[in-house]
Each structure stands twice: as C-alpha cells, then as structure tokens.
Amino acid sequence: MKRKFEAPQIAMDSAVCCTPRTMDADNRWNASVPSPERHREAGMVVRESNAFGAVAPATRGLAGMTGSVGKCNDMMMNSGSWVDVSRMTDARVKDNEQVFTSLIKTQVLDSSVEKKDKTERSIHIWRPALDGDEKETSKKDVDVEVSRAARIWRPNDPQPEAHSTTATTMTMGDQERNESSRYVDDFDSDGDDEHLDEHGSNAGDRPTKRKQRRYRTTFTSYQLEELERAFCKTHYPDVFTREELAMRVDLTEARVQVWFQNRRAKWRKREKLGLQPRLHPHPHFGPILGGPISDSNLVSSHLCRLACIDRAHRQGLLTSPPPPPFV
C-alpha cells in the first residue's frame, strides 16, 4: 500500500524525479548518487512508496526536505534531461536479450567448428595410411594369398589321399573329359600301366620348373586279374569298392583309383582307333579283334572276357562251362 506523506507536494515530486537516478534496473543503488545513509545523515528517512521501486523521503522538517530537493534538482539539471523509467528498462532488457542471443550463437558456432575440426583431424589421421601404405600392404597380402592358394594343388603334384576324395565328388562326364585330356598323350607307347606314374604321365612329359618325384608300381598277374575283373563290372567304382579291392590285392586305394583312371583312358583310346576287342555272343569263341594289338593288351582283354563269362554263369545265363584259361 502506498503510504501517505505529510510533506508538501513539491517534495513528493522532487523525490519521484530523483528515483531513476538513484536505482538501477536490478534495484541496486547507483554509486554516482548519494546512498540512503547519506540521506539519513542529512536528516532523511527512506521508505518504499510505490510499485515502481521509487523511494520517497519523509522528512522531519521542511528544512531537510528543502535541502534534499535542492540537491536532487541540481543533479537532474547537470544530467541535462529527465529520464523515463519504462523506456530505460525496455532498452536494458533488449540489450540483455541481444547479448544473450549473441552468446548462444557464439557457443553453437564454436561447438560446430570444434566438431568439424575433430572430424577432419580423425580423417586426416587414418585416411592417408589407408590410401598409401595400407593399400600397398593389403595388395601384397592378396598376392601372397593367391600364390599360396595356387600352390596348394597342381595337377602333377602327388596327392594320393586328396585326389581320392575329390574324385568321388566329380561327375562321370567331368572325369571323362579330364582324363581324356590328361592321358591322351600317355598311350603312344605300348600302353603298359607300369610305364605310368601315379597320375598317368610319362617321365618325359612336359618339363616342369621343379623336380617332381614319381612313383611307379609293378602289378602282379593276380593283381591285374582282379583289377580287370572289377573293371569289367564297372568302369567307375565308388570309394567303397576301391577300398575293398585294394585290401584284396594288397594295394592302396589311391593306387587302385589311378589304375582305373589309366584303364579308362586306354579303353577310350582303343574305341576311338577301332582296336577294342568285341566279345562274341558264344563263350567258346575268342575275341574278335579289330586290328593288331600287343600281348599285354591281349592278356587284359582275355581276362576281361573271362570275368564277363564268369559273371554270366553265376547269374544263370550260360549253361556250358567256361573255356580253359588263356596260356
């Protein structure tokens, strides 16, 4: 509530006029204006008078009030003009808002610039390494791995176990094409299996960069007979049949597989040249030959014919006994 002053009206007007010069926007005393303590020394009592923060001095006497009014008038006259309280408050608020907005913009810009600098520094750290040394290193590693993978398997390298497992996964057509291309030059000689190594290549085949170790196997008559019997039954025995036959003839499964590969290649070459012996329907007749062949081929063909006749007798297709063995 407003307090009613007993001072004259001129004193009230003078006190209100002095108010803006004695208080700042935060209701703090301005150092350039005499503080309330100095007014008390002069015989004044300062109290709150209205809602605008104005102070109204209540005097004990007219002489003290007159002195204060005179001081206030002198100060206002020296300042040059009367100041509006509301206009000054609005200007200060706008200034504060502008300062606050500029501070926020500055902080946002600083943070964005800092993030951009960090990103550029991080890119600058790893990208030259990746584009330069790392790319060359990765390329060298790839070349090393490719050359290592190329040395894992070569057609002329001895692979007894790995070759047996890969052969079972190949189709019959792929085996025929591979074997025909691999063994077509190996039968220009007399065609004996003893002159072939494990992979059906002669010693004087293509020259290689490194010296290769070749293994040759000499088959006995019993082994050849059993192998020819199995070949007459099927040209492509599975891995179980090969293992059983290898145990029976005292050979390794890989060697039996290589023998079947060589035998199939020999069979195809004879059919291509028209030299393959054709079995006569009657068992007592010998093979009808389409041309001259060697003694070893004749023995193999006769053994194959005997195996076919024996199988026919077991199945009950023939009633007459088989002919005596070939001497």
From Swiss-Prot:
Family annotation (CDD domains): homeodomain (cd00086)
Record's compositionally biased regions (Basic and acidic residues):
174-185
Q: Where is the composition biased (Polar residues)?
A: 162-172
* Residue ranges, annotated region (Disordered): 152-214
Task: Please tell me where this protein is predominantly located.
Answer: nucleus
Q: Which GO terms describe its molecular function?
A: DNA-binding transcription factor activity, RNA polymerase II-specific; RNA polymerase II transcription regulatory region sequence-specific DNA binding
DNA-binding region of this protein: 212-271
For this chain's UniProt record, which GO biological process terms are given?
A: regulation of transcription by RNA polymerase II
Q: Could you tell me the keywords of this UniProt record?
A: Developmental protein, DNA-binding, Homeobox, Nucleus, Transcription, Transcription regulation
- List compositional bias (Acidic residues) regions by residue number: 186-195
Q: Which family does the record assign?
A: Belongs to the paired homeobox family. Bicoid subfamily.
Protein name per the record: Aristaless homeobox protein
Task: List the top taxonomic levels of the source.
Answer: Eukaryota, Metazoa, Echinodermata, Eleutherozoa, Echinozoa
